[in-house]
Design a protein with these regions (language model features):
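A generic structural signal for well-ordered alpha-helical segments enriched in polar/charged residues
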Residues: 7, 11-14, 45, 100-107, ...
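A short secondary-structure junction motif
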Residues: 16, 112-115, 152
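Acidic/histidine-rich alpha-helical segments that form the ligand environment
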Residues: 70-119, 133-141
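Short, contiguous alpha-helical
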Residues: 2-13, 20-77, 121-181
Length: 181
């Protein structure tokens, strides 16, 4: 999952200006900054708040301060006005947050016993939503959002393919060296 993120997300963002990241092809469309931030918040919430029943990294590590957003903001159910009003994000900070979330996700997955795939952490509020369904959701939604980011880039820059999209000669570094892999 990380490899797909690193091989597609970072090149799709590479070299984009702040204005390009805020481009909306329609008044009711999301822009790249919102999509990337939303992806990180979704994964953080699912892995920490839902699966592990702990506070998110957003809360624990005060990423909201680093990104200049309210601590309770989760990126869900935004109105068009809220998407437009999202403060301009420093993409390096947003990606640092996403990488911290992804490293925490990988550590969680490293210790996840197979029996937990069928566990439903919150049967009252989310009956039938198991760890396995949550992980499937993260993969599908993440893939959809990666496609949206690449599409928004393509709308603005045309058929521009960063070298790393088509070549594995310069791979991204392995995530989370502390995992020992």
């Amino acid at each position: 999952m990380y490899k797909i993120w690193a091989d597609v997300e970072r090149p799709a963002l590479s070299g984009l200006t702040a204005a390009e990241r805020r481009f909306q092809p329609h008044a009711h469309a999301n822009h790249i900054d919102f999509i990337v931030w939303h992806m990180a918040r979704d994964e953080d919430g699912e892995i920490h708040t839902f699966a592990q029943r702990t506070n998110s990294l957003w809360q624990r590590e005060a990423w909201y301060e680093k990104l200049g957003l309210p601590p309770e903001d989760d990126g869900f159910g935004y109105t068009v006005e809220q998407v437009v009003a999202l403060p301009r994000l420093a993409i390096a900070d947003c990606l640092a947050y996403y990488e911290a979330v992804r490293c925490a996700t990988l550590r969680y997955l490293d210790g996840l016993p197979p029996a937990d795939w069928e566990r439903c952490p919150d049967p009252t509020r989310r009956p039938g939503y198991t760890i396995g369904r949550m992980l499937s959701h993260l993969i599908v939604e993440g893939s959809q959002h990666l496609g949206q980011v690449a599409y928004l880039r393509g709308l603005q820059r045309g058929l521009e393919y960063p070298t790393s999209w088509v070549s594995s000669r310069t791979p991204w570094p392995e995530p989370c060296p502390e995992r020992g892999r």
